[in-house]
Amino acid sequence: MKPLSSPLQQYWQTVVERLPEPLAEKSLSAQAKSVLTFSDFVQDSVIAHPEWLTELESQSPQADEWQHYAAWLQEALSNVSDEAGLMRELRLFRRRIMVRIAWAQTLALVTEESILQQLSHLAETLIVAARDWLYDACCREWGTPCNAQGEAQPLLILGMGKLGGGELNFSSDIDLIFAWPEHGCTQGGRRELDNAQFFTRMGQRLIKVLDQPTQDGFVYRVDMRLRPFGESGPLVLSFAALEDYYQEQGRDWERYAMVKARIMGDSEGVYANELRAMLRPFVFRRYIDFSVIQSLRNMKGMIAREVRRRGLTDNIKLGAGGIREIEFIVQVFQLIRGGREPSLQSRSLLPTLSAIAALHLLSENDAEQLRVAYLFLRRLENLLQSINDEQTQTLPSDELNRARLAWAMDFADWPQLTGALTAHMTNVRRVFNELIGDDESETQEESLSEQWRELWQDALQEDDTTPVLAHLSEDDRKQVLTLIADFRKELDKRTIGPRGRQVLDHLMPHLLSDVCAREDAAVTLSRITALLVGIVTRTTYLELLSEFRAALKHLISLCAASPMIASQLARYPLLLDELLDPNTLYQPTATDAYRDELRQYLLRVPEDDEEQQLEALRQFKQAQLLRIAAADIAGTLPVMKVSDHLTWLAEAMIDAVVQQAWVQMVARYGKPNHLNDREGRGFAVVGYGKLGGWELGYSSDLDLIFLHDCPMDAMTDGEREIDGRQFYLRLAQRIMHLFSTRTSSGILYEVDARLRPSGAAGMLVTSAEAFADYQKNEAWTWEHQALVRARVVYGDPQLTAHFDAVRREIMTLPREGKTLQTEVREMREKMRAHLGNKHRNRFDIKADEGGITDIEFITQYLVLRYAHEKPKLTRWSDNVRILELLAQNDIMEEQEAMALTRAYTTLRDELHHLALQELPGHVPEDCFTAERELVRASWQKWLVEE
């Protein structure tokens, strides 16, 4: 064993001072001194449990002792009689065995492969023991879940990721998916439960037993987000539901995740074999699957963006050439050829890597370099985490931990360790780039005229610029030169560094060559230099634009087309990553896929890190907004589709925000107990206005109200018990907070909740019964108008159906035509007096006479006036489809409805384009005269004439 280095010998004296008397220095072996000096986790553990150190000294850890874990744990659990005792024994057992593993790892008593096997088997042993104990307890309490034939149904657990692959790291989350075979009911209990209820309750208890921190710590952090539908999906699914999901909706990333899935415990039982056979066709295609290559290229880009986003320069997992890239290389071959080559279907990385080499898919040299790098990186990762039992892959910056790692990795000092690390990661990165390179060969850098370089470096006199700027007017030439000079002055005020300056000197001649070829060169350059000023100290982004000429061209064209986009990119340069792939830049996410895309995006963020969750939500929204705007500018999205995309995006954000707020509130207070015997959360979010009407614009706020169906006597079931209705009030407040909190990426949305009953004076969240009563007995006509454009944008089916019924009932009430006409007209006149005619010789597209609001009032009036006779008018909440319904139900002539629809979409289209130009929503008075005249005539017909 290598002696401790000088810094560690000095630190040993600090350790000695902490040790209790029974662990006196003279009684400790050299091995014990080394491990206690290296790991604070081991040190703290043996101080609390001195008998563990005695055991370690007398029974040194062995490579095959994982075979005894189950028996040792069974003995520890033999006298456990309740859940609290189970939680305590599981935590103590995990800590005791982790100390033994840390001891063996620090002293290199066993191979790194053995360490990974022991860590994974320990986790599996603890998970299975907890499951089996709880299954028996739940069966005693609720009866045994059975299928239609009366056969007992088990809970099967899929271990995902490194747990499934038998490669768990020292301090790790565990990713699980729960499933049961067949539907049925419990037998032998006090009352019958269906299997879904039984396994959901049991699953919740299992997560609590493993995950909940106590005075003894926790067993593992449990992550269930890889299950179908993520956090919004059922906690446990039947085999049939799993099969339907993966056949109909399984995404590429879920295929990648399922490669490593392994059934915990009895993996050879009948049900285990059935589940495995069901999943195999989804993961491994029977044909050679080259369709996956583009997805893998996209994932490569995601990795690179993740590294840039989080500044992961010292991260041995996610950094360039890190563990993630080795895993990715291996998965490439598994997913492309695994259906044809059974040897590639292993869950574990090293056997699969050997199979790849045997099939000559990689050279022997590359495969060996990857194997050696993987074992080096995994040992370094596990040693790093075992210092404090901390989930980290970032290299330390302090001298003590650097000295610890250098010693344990068998290097003389830190520089020698980092030198070897760099060599390994360079090898990995080379193979990674060769394997997942772009399908187009990189073109040679275009030769640039020396004049563009001179223009950037201020080596040209004004007269000399004529040849390169000949197509520009004299004023524009002067403006371009002034912009370049001002930009250089701004650079002098900033600390860029030699590398940043070098990249900028390479980038700017290309940029000027492309920009100055345009007729609008001066305007475009002014927008781009404003953006560059914000990123010149962040060399990564300059390199992105310098190395990817296509990204630079997209930047120029988008900034030329829209100052709004230029401003967004300047405020949030992370969005520059979106310029790399034109396939996604100009092709927004499918309208029904925003929720799934967001769920995948959030998987990268720790669930308990609220700050990162808030940032991720905002970053996702901004990236999607950029794609929608780019497609709008390119003309690939008509105005109706722009609003559809903006609305679906907002609904995905609402879904995620409610989910986060719910998790936080339930962790604090538990759930309202009226939910124990029903599905859903008893909560709904109703969208009004532009959100309700599928008509959001780029900068629209969200008009929301919150509903619940909680009984008066309900309480929460957590340790901090509160009134159920108080829970929903705090939930709504939390949702508002998550939307409005300003982070470095701004706010998510402005939210206006004043359309709730009694407005700002009313409760933030309203019971469904109170909402119905208010609408029937207290609401004004304008509130019924607002209800025309209202719909549930988040909520369980029960509450959604209730709201829809109330809305339909209110809208179909018989109304006296003249009275309604007067009330609607007078409300519009008040609004026009307050909001319209504010700009002399200008037409406010929304607020002035003949504008958008007049069309909205016409449709609302006609729905309220005629829905009693034609209930089908209540079906839709958007103006365009309401106009269709009015024509279909013979209330409005088809020609008039089509003309109003054209006027409405034309005016909305102009508002979108004004927003892209960062211009206010008014135009010269002589614009849209035909549309305005048409709207005035319709207004006169319906709301003035008797």
Swiss-Prot record:
Reactions mediated catalytically: [glutamine synthetase]-O(4)-(5'-adenylyl)-L-tyrosine + phosphate = [glutamine synthetase]-L-tyrosine + ADP; [glutamine synthetase]-L-tyrosine + ATP = [glutamine synthetase]-O(4)-(5'-adenylyl)-L-tyrosine + diphosphate
Any GO molecular function: [glutamine synthetase]-adenylyl-L-tyrosine phosphorylase activity
Keywords, comma-separated and alphabetical: ATP-binding, Magnesium, Multifunctional enzyme, Nucleotide-binding, Nucleotidyltransferase, Transferase
Xref: Gene3D superfamilies: 1.20.120.1510, Beta Polymerase, domain 2, Glutamine synthase adenylyltransferase GlnE, Nucleotidyltransferases domain 2
Stretch list, region Adenylyl removase: 1-440
Entry's family note: Belongs to the GlnE family.
Protein's recorded name: Bifunctional glutamine synthetase adenylyltransferase/adenylyl-removing enzyme
